Amino acid sequence: MHDITDLPAWERLFKKIVWKQLGDMEGKKILDFGSGEGITANHFAEKNDVTAIEPSKEMLSNAWKDYEYTQIVGDVNALSAFKNETFDMIICHNVLEYIDDKAAVVKALARVLKKDGIISIVKHNRAGRVMQMAVLLDDFEKANEILDGKDSTASKFGTIRYYEDNDITKWEPQITVSDILGIRTFWDLQQNQQKHGDEAWQEKMLQLELRVSQMQE
């Protein structure tokens, strides 16, 4: 049985924040598109009917599957197997940045989402990346490039192609943005690695992150 404490501290905090924001779900049909190692799919599969789609066989070799869920190896084309309005909830976390045709993916996801369903999209924050480059990495050249609208990179996944929140509704007008929440606002600013490993500190940080995640400014 996998446990969230098996994850690096930063990822553990990320998952806890996102799961808390999504809320407790039971008896729902959920799609995790770009499911990676299946950590979130596995979490919600305890009480829900979950389908996970992931193109990387390498990531799936380490998949968490303590609870039963359907795993599909594939990409957006795999969605053609599902009828319109199949899912109550669609999870698409840190995925669209790495896709060339974002509009096609968003439209395909919207098709299989129920009329009263919810799609949870987690995206990279351009301003946060600029702060990371300027404050933490002392890379002013890269910070300015990102401010100028250029792409960035992630060591594990490649080029990060940033997009804005309102792009989502431009790609698919049937989707409306009901809420915008923050994730991991403060964590990376603490550079003391010993602090990161302190469970009491982690809990205090989690509560603070959750508190500010709903603030609009």
What are these regions (language model features)?
Residues 89-101:
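A short SAM/SAH-binding and catalytic strip from SAM-dependent methyltransferases
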Residues 103-118:
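A short glycine-rich, Lys/Arg-flanked "PGG" loop and its adjoining helix->strand segment in the class I
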Residues 1-26, 39-43, 59-62, 118-146:
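Conserved class I S-adenosyl-L-methionine
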Residues 37-78:
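Class I SAM-dependent methyltransferase SAM/SAH-binding core
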Residues 170, 179-217:
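A C-terminal cap/extension of S-adenosyl-L-methionine-dependent methyltransferases
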Residues 157-175, 180:
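Short alpha-helix
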Residues 81-89:
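A short acidic, Gly/Pro-enriched loop at the edge of an enzyme's catalytic core
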